[in-house]
Amino acid sequence: MSLIVVRTHSFLFVLVLLLFASVFHSVDSQVFNPNGRYGRRDSASALSDASENKESSLGMKVYREISQDAQMENAEDRQFENQEYQS
């Protein structure tokens, strides 16, 4: 009887541990590395890779999405630099 209890508890412990690891990885990748969906730290290198593959429809979709992200980052950088320059 006690062997069944130990096996059940061990199985449940491993199951909860895997669930925790999965949730932690998901939150970690979204919070600490928001550009991680491209496997890059900056959008410029991702944009250059996507531009090489833009012949395919998926490559073109990724190219557009990354170029929009890059434009938004550049606009935010310019706005921040203007605020620093004015103050």
Swiss-Prot record:
UniProt entry tagged with the keyword Secreted: yes
Signal peptide coordinates: 1-29
GO-annotated molecular function: toxin activity
The name this protein goes by in its record: U-scoloptoxin(23)-Er1a
Broad class of the protein's primary localization: secreted
Keywords: Secreted, Signal, Toxin
Tissue and organ expression note: Expressed by the venom gland.
